[in-house]
Regions:
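Conserved lysine of the Walker
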Residues: 103
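Extreme N-terminal, non-catalytic leader segments
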Residues: 2, 15, 28-89
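Post-Walker A alpha-helix
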Residues: 106-107
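Active-site beta-strand termini and strand-to-loop segments that position acidic
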Residues: 7-9, 87-88, 292-295
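Actinobacteria-biased recognition of intrinsically disordered, low-complexity terminal regions
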Residues: 1-5, 249-270, 357-385
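Short alpha-helical segments that sit at the start of domains
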Residues: 276-313
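Glycine-rich, often acidic-flanked micro-motifs
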Residues: 10-27, 42, 71, 81-83, ...
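Long, charge-rich, low-complexity alpha-helical segments
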Residues: 300-385
Length: 385
């Protein structure tokens, strides 16, 4: 790695291998990544492309470094597609949103007043510590078709405070026209969960993804939404988006549903839960978030509401009648509606969504048989069974 740059990205030391670049291209790489430079041996390496324009080189390098760092930390950190801004005492606010939501613009404006953590990814470990990624920002410049990659210091963005950074706020960006100033509102976790999942990298590799998210959300006092038109309006409200003393995240234990025997008449169909990677109970009102992973390792979060949570919890090889009883026991009779019709409709939706599976009831087991093992000598004329 002699003569190449080592940078800090999401808690990983990434070596930028620039051996094939000319002097101008190498200087451009050094200048773009100067604020992320660190010491020590690289954990992983990314080889800079040769050929093409310097702007194309820097853009490609930024994307590849990001992907390599995220890949290196998969399953270890909660990595949010978010901008990160640090207050002087090290508390960090994560501004969450997809591409085009305004994260880079918000980073530039807020970074002039506070510390720039990242405009791309906020990586948080199990203790709530944030690992910075002071990558160059992609900037549109007049008369240029390709975006420029400018270092935070060149753009006048703030340095990070000494010491460790700690997650203190999770904020969903809501940039839209016609908003005067910045309007801050609380967001229920159940309502924010789908977006937080969508903006998380390699969530399926975390052992308890939903409960991990919930633990971090609880440690910062909940999720907030900030609606605004001009990013300048965010400067004055940023401190109130950070909790004063974030607590250490505590991941809750998994819910144990146990088993239930099938009693009463033998049903034509029985229903069972499709096992999720993780589940998260949500209160007020009673809801249940489920995170399923398909054969392609893609994750899907679903928040069950209404009578669906009770149906899912009760679906342990039982028939429709037992599910009706479970719904009535949990939420009461539905008044003038037919409980069986309502439950059957809800169950059909859960089956269609691959949350429940349906099968025929198990048949009585065949009479027990004995068999002589294949490696035992057998001299009789009858079969081994």
């Amino acid at each position: 790695m002699t003569g190449n740059l080592v940078i800090a990205a999401l808690g990983v030391r990434v070596g930028l291998v620039c051996d094939g670049l000319d002097a101008d291209a190498r200087t451009a790489v050094d200048e773009a990544w100067t604020d992320a430079a660190t010491t020590g041996a690289a954990d992983i390496e990314v080889v800079a492309d040769t050929g093409g324009s310097i702007r194309s080189l820097l853009s490609s390098l930024s994307q590849r470094v990001t992907l390599a760092a995220i890949e290196a930390q998969r399953g270890r950190l909660w990595m949010l597609h978010a901008a990160g801004i640090a207050l002087p005492d090290g508390r960090v606010v994560a501004l969450v949103g997809p591409s085009g939501r305004g994260k880079t613009t918000a980073s530039r404006v807020l970074g002039e007043a506070y510390g720039y953590v990242s405009d791309e990814t906020v990586a948080v470990d199990s203790s709530g510590r944030v690992h910075p990624y002071r990558k160059p920002l992609s900037i549109i410049e007049p008369g240029e078709s390709e975006k420029a990659q400018r270092s935070p210091s060149v753009l006048g963005l703030g340095r990070l405070p000494d010491g460790e950074l700690q997650l203190a706020g999770i904020v969903v960006l809501d940039r839209r026209e016609g908003v005067s100033g910045a309007v801050v509102s609380d967001v229920d976790l159940g309502d924010a969960l789908e977006e937080l999942v969508a903006q998380s990298s390699y969530l399926t590799n975390l052992p308890a993804p939903l409960r991990t998210i919930a633990a971090h959300v609880a440690s910062v006092g909940g999720v907030r939404r900030v609606s605004y038109t001009d990013a300048a309006a965010l400067v004055s409200v940023l401190p109130e988006l950070a909790v004063e003393s974030p607590s250490r995240p505590r991941v809750s234990k998994p819910v144990s549903l146990g088993g239930s025997a099938v009693v009463g008449s033998s049903p034509d169909r029985v229903f069972r839960r499709v096992a999720p990677l993780d589940e998260l109970p949500l209160a007020d009102p009673d809801r249940l978030a489920l995170f399923h992973v398909d054969a392609a390792h893609a994750g899907t979060v679903r928040v069950l509401a209404g009578i669906a949570p009770a149906l899912w919890r009760a679906a342990d090889g039982v028939g429709l009648e037992a599910l009706v009883d479970a719904a009535i026991s949990a939420y009461g009779a539905p008044g003038d509606k037919d409980a069986t019709v309502a439950v059957e409709a809800a169950v059909d939706e859960l089956v269609a969504a691959d949350v429940l599976k349906v099968s025929s009831p198990a048949k009585a087991s065949d009479p027990a048989l004995w068999r002589i093992h294949d490696d035992v000598a057998w001299t009789g004329e009858s079969s081994r069974v």
